[in-house]
């Protein structure tokens, strides 16, 4: 027989994954920086600025790293979680999830090329088609998000809203980049 439990709500900001979405240059990175400054101090707030994202550049005092591809991102996350004593941060942002998705797609396309010795036309054609490429992208992203969630760090995901309307799980209309929508619709339980 199942035991009835009472749900407890946490008021610790690190216990949730936060999603900040908005138009370019509206202040998403600034919002994360200010939340970090108030909650734990800027010295304990880290921005993972993906690829060519530059929102962190106008935020004085905000620590950041700038992985240029999926392998650099993965290696950094692995090191940060494996050796937390070297990373005194409490809050971490991935800025932006749009670039993270693009990096994951590039990684999957390279893996396809290595395995099949020929390029595929799109992510949909990777690994024989039928959504296998998208599934591989979702796995890569979900694994990294879960790794961070299971660690000591609070996680903020920052993204751009654009291109296509989508309704989130609470019925709120948002607009997201098509590739980001495809990936995060599969991992919505992770995003919170």
Where are the language model's segments positioned?
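Catalytic-core regions built around general acid/base machinery
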Residues: 140-151
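Short, conserved acidic/polar surface loops in the N-terminal third of protein domains
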Residues: 102-107, 142, 167-169
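A solvent-exposed, charged loop/short amphipathic helix patch at secondary-structure junctions
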Residues: 105-136
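Short, basic, glycine/proline-bearing loop/turn elements
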Residues: 15-21, 59-65, 124-133, 171-176
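Phosphate-binding/switch region of NTP-binding enzymes
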Residues: 6, 147, 154-192
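Conserved P-loop
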Residues: 2-94, 98-106
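Amphipathic alpha-helical transducer elements in NTP-driven molecular machines
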Residues: 67-74, 91, 127, 131-142, ...
């Amino acid at each position: 027989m199942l035991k009835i439990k009472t749900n407890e709500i946490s008021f610790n900001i690190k216990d949730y994954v936060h999603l900040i979405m908005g138009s370019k240059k509206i202040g998403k990175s600034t919002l994360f920086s200010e939340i970090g400054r108030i909650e734990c101090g800027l010295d304990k707030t880290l921005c993972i600025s993906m690829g060519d994202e530059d929102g962190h550049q106008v935020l004085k005092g905000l620590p950041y790293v700038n992985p240029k591809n999926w392998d650099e991102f993965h290696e950094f996350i692995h090191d940060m979680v494996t050796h937390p004593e070297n990373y005194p941060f409490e809050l971490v942002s991935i800025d932006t999830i749009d670039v993270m998705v693009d990096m994951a797609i590039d990684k999957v396309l390279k893996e396809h090329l290595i395995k099949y010795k020929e390029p595929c036309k799109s992510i949909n054609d990777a690994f024989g088609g039928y959504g296998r490429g998208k599934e591989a992208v979702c796995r890569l992203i979900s694994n990294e998000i879960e790794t961070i969630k299971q660690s000591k760090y609070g996680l903020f995901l920052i993204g751009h809203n654009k291109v296509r309307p989508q309704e989130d799980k609470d019925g709120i209309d948002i607009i997201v980049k098509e590739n980001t929508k495809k990936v995060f619709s599969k991992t919505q339980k992770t995003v919170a």
